A protein has these predicted regions:
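Catalytic phosphate/metal-binding cores of nucleic-acid and nucleotide-processing enzymes, i.e., regions
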Residues: 1-3, 9-10, 73, 90-92, ...
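Active-site rim helix/loop that mediates acceptor-substrate recognition in acyltransferases
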Residues: 6-27, 35
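Conserved beta-strand in the GNAT
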Residues: 30, 38-51
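A short, internal acetyl-CoA/4′-phosphopantetheine-binding micro-motif in the GNAT/acyltransferase core
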Residues: 32, 51-66, 91-92
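Conserved acetyl-CoA-binding loop-helix of GNAT-fold acetyltransferases
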Residues: 63-77, 99-104
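Conserved beta-strand-loop-alpha-helix junction that forms the acyl-donor binding cleft
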Residues: 88-99
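Conserved acetyl-CoA-binding loop of GNAT-fold acetyltransferases
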Residues: 103-113
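C-terminal "cap" of GNAT-fold acetyltransferases
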Residues: 112-132
Length: 132
């Protein structure tokens, strides 16, 4: 299923449009996984103060802490930039794994949205991993 829970996969045009939008709004990163001595792209994340959409496309790699490591890295990036808060605009109600992962990284529910929850991470409330 696409990230938004729609039944039909995105068309190539939709995907191109999505990446153009994301590149304009934030820092777009491709997530890679080392497997058999080679780095393979497995997902992406875009980072800006107002949102952090992340996708790990390979189901066999879900639950291995990859997303958590990416989010922790982006929290450190937010500190470098000087942000005091960062947000996730919406995590869908059905996506309990993402809710748990973001909450484990220090994000807290901020407000109910149409399809889920908006989250905030107040950087002063969580430990700086770079000094640990």
């Amino acid at each position: 299923l696409p990230m938004d829970g729609a039944v039909n996969p995105y068309s190539l045009e939709n995907i191109k449009g999505m990446y153009q939008y994301l590149r304009k709004h934030g820092e777009l990163y491709i997530i890679e996984y080392l497997e058999n001595g080679e780095w393979n792209p497995i997902g992406d994340v875009t980072f800006w103060r107002e949102d952090m959409p992340i996708v790990i496309g390979r189901k066999d790699l879900h639950g291995r802490g990859i997303g958590k490591r990416v989010v922790h890295s982006l929290i450190e990036r937010a500190r470098e930039i000087g942000y005091s808060e960062i947000y996730v605009q919406e995590i869908y109600d059905f996506n309990l794994a993402s809710q748990k992962m973001f909450e484990g990284c220090g994000f807290r529910r901020m407000e109910k949205t149409e399809k889920g929850w908006r989250y905030v991470c107040r950087l002063n409330d969580i430990k700086d991993k770079s000094n640990a």
